């Protein structure tokens, strides 16, 4: 099935890309979630518009991403968590928890999808978490987990 992406899809492409996927993946996931539209000749103009808008936004967002990265590098956010007797967390710290903590600490608003946790945070202490700000720009934020009182 030939589709045009309207939203970024991990390991597939960015808006405006023409992709060939299996019928089931297209019909059951990409189309219902509005991540893609069916490819037609008339959609070629739409592809060009999406690509042009993406390039204009990319130039602006690259500069913004550099500024956000410099803000995040100096930021230490605290996440309050429930802890057991042995110092281990009940559950784990999620990307949503980190995004909320960054916002509360006066940092920039981050999407939880942009936060990359390599291994689950299940202990008390300081942890470094990656943040994908742009295709070529990644930042880091320090997350300190503290036990709830």
From Swiss-Prot:
The keyword Hydrolase does not apply. One of its GO terms (cellular component) is ribosome. It comes from the Bacteria. One of its GO terms (molecular function) is rRNA binding. One of its GO terms (biological process) is translation. Gene3D superfamilies: Ribosomal protein L9, C-terminal domain, Ribosomal protein L9, N-terminal domain. Transmembrane segments: none annotated. The keyword RNA-binding applies. Keywords: Ribonucleoprotein, Ribosomal protein, RNA-binding, rRNA-binding. Belongs to the bacterial ribosomal protein bL9 family. NCBIfam families: L9 (TIGR00158). Binds to the 23S rRNA. This is Large ribosomal subunit protein bL9. It comes from Cutibacterium acnes (strain DSM 16379 / KPA171202). The gene is rplI.
């Amino acid at each position: 099935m030939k589709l045009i992406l309207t939203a970024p899809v991990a390991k597939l492409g960015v808006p405006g890309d023409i992709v060939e996927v299996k019928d089931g993946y297209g019909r059951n996931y990409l189309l219902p979630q509005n991540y893609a539209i069916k490819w037609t000749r008339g959609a070629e103009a739409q592809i060009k518009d999406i690509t042009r808008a993406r390039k204009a936004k990319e130039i602006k967002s690259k500069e913004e991403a550099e500024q956000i990265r410099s803000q995040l590098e100096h930021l230490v956010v605290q996440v309050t968590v429930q802890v057991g007797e042995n110092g281990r967390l009940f559950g784990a710290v999620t990307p949503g928890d980190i995004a909320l903590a960054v916002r509360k600490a006066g940092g920039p608003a981050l999407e939880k999808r942009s936060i990359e946790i390599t291994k689950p945070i299940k202990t008390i202490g300081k942890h470094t978490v990656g943040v994908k700000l742009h295709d070529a720009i990644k930042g880091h934020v320090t997350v300190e987990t503290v036990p709830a009182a």
